């Protein structure tokens, strides 16, 4: 994982890039996400293949994560398919999440947006394959983030939730 530019002076988020994961996302088995992270959302599906999750985890720069979030205990990898119409409104993540890394598994139309507490746009992460964002949560300056799939195609990402 290569950490690049900070997205905005008021957002603790940096563009990242990883080697090609070579995951055939369109042919994976997905199940409707179970609601443990996102209640009442019926437009996000999850793949539970542990070998793929380990492959993704091995591409992350754990030393860099430890340096930025020394109190972290674990990294929970999720592989998502967001169908057209998927939307997470501007929000803060759960308190047990210290940060996250989103990686696009294909070129997606939409990507994570960061907003202030008046929901004014601040920055947007990359939507390109093998690129994404590393965001530190619960440290100042605080901000909201949101995502929506406005395309007519599925959006494929992996998210490493740093706890």
Listing of model-derived features with the role each one plays in the protein:
Residues 1-71:
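Non-heme Fe(II)/2-oxoglutarate
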Residues 21, 70-73, 140, 151-153:
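Exposed regions on extracellular, virion, or secretory-pathway luminal proteins
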Residues 26-27, 31-33, 37-51, 55, ...:
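N-acyltransferase acceptor-side catalytic subdomain
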Residues 52-53, 72-78, 129-134:
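N-terminal start-of-chain detector that recognizes signal peptides
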Residues 63-99, 103-117:
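Non-heme Fe(II) oxygenase catalytic core, chiefly the N-lobe of the double-stranded beta-helix
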Residues 85-86, 95-97, 107-163:
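Catalytic core of Fe(II)/2-oxoglutarate
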């Amino acid at each position: 994982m290569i950490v690049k530019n900070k997205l905005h002076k008021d957002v603790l988020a940096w563009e990242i890039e990883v080697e090609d994961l070579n995951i055939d996302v369109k042919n994976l088995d997905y199940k409707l996400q179970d609601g443990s992270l996102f209640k009442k959302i019926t437009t996000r599906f999850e793949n539970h293949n542990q070998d793929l999750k380990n492959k993704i985890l091995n591409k992350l720069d754990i030393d860099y994560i430890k340096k930025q979030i020394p109190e972290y205990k674990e990294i929970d990898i999720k592989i998502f398919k967001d169908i057209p119409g998927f939307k997470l409104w501007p929000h803060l993540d759960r308190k047990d999440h210290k940060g996250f890394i989103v990686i696009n598994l294909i070129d997606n139309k939409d990507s994570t947006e960061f907003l202030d507490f008046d929901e004014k746009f601040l920055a947007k992460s990359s939507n390109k394959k093998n690129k994404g964002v590393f965001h530190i949560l619960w440290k100042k300056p605080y901000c909201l983030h949101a995502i929506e799939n406005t395309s007519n195609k599925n959006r494929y990402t992996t998210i490493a939730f740093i706890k």
